[in-house]
Amino acid sequence: MMQPKRTKFRKQFKGRIHGNSKGGTDLNFGAFGLKALEPERVTARQIEAARRAITRHMKRAGRVWIRIFPDLPVTSKPTEVRMGKGKGSVDYWACRVAPGRVMFELDGVPEDVAREALRLGAAKLPIKTRFIQRIAE
């Protein structure tokens, strides 16, 4: 699973996702992509599950680019522990995804294969998504 090699601080504030994505809204690498339509935190496990579903359907053909990275540490306190006594330890890593953000890109496969692969990957994610493709020039 993806997580940063090192960070300046171990824990971060929860934060909010305001407005649309400021960058990463266009296809940069592949011919097909999966774009987020709503704001949400996506965990490293969800990203990995989607990646596995996509590559499994593509049967190792083509190429997959993951355009999001889980760099947000999410903390939690153990069960049945009273409030207070400081912030909990890091439980998992997540990524804030704003509407309009391209999360996955594919290339080297036909459109019908790419559409089905990204549909299977989108089922593993907690947000509504849209299939996008590069406009033929």
UniProtKB/Swiss-Prot annotation:
GO MF entries: rRNA binding; structural constituent of ribosome; tRNA binding
Regions that span the bilayer: none
Annotated Gene3D superfamilies: Ribosomal protein L10e/L16
InterPro entries registered for this protein in UniProt: Ribosomal_uL16, Ribosomal_uL16_bact-type, Ribosomal_uL16_CS, Ribosomal_uL16_dom, Ribosomal_uL16_sf
Example GO BP: translation
UniProt entry keywords in alphabetical sequence: Ribonucleoprotein, Ribosomal protein, RNA-binding, rRNA-binding, tRNA-binding
Xref: PROSITE patterns: RIBOSOMAL_L16_1 (PS00586), RIBOSOMAL_L16_2 (PS00701)
Pfam family, one: Ribosomal_L16
Keyword rRNA-binding among UniProt keywords: yes
GO cellular component, one term: cytosolic large ribosomal subunit
Main function: Binds 23S rRNA and is also seen to make contacts with the A and possibly P site tRNAs.
Subunit organization: Part of the 50S ribosomal subunit.
Family to which this protein belongs: Belongs to the universal ribosomal protein uL16 family.
Name of the molecule in the record: Large ribosomal subunit protein uL16
Gene responsible for this protein: rplP
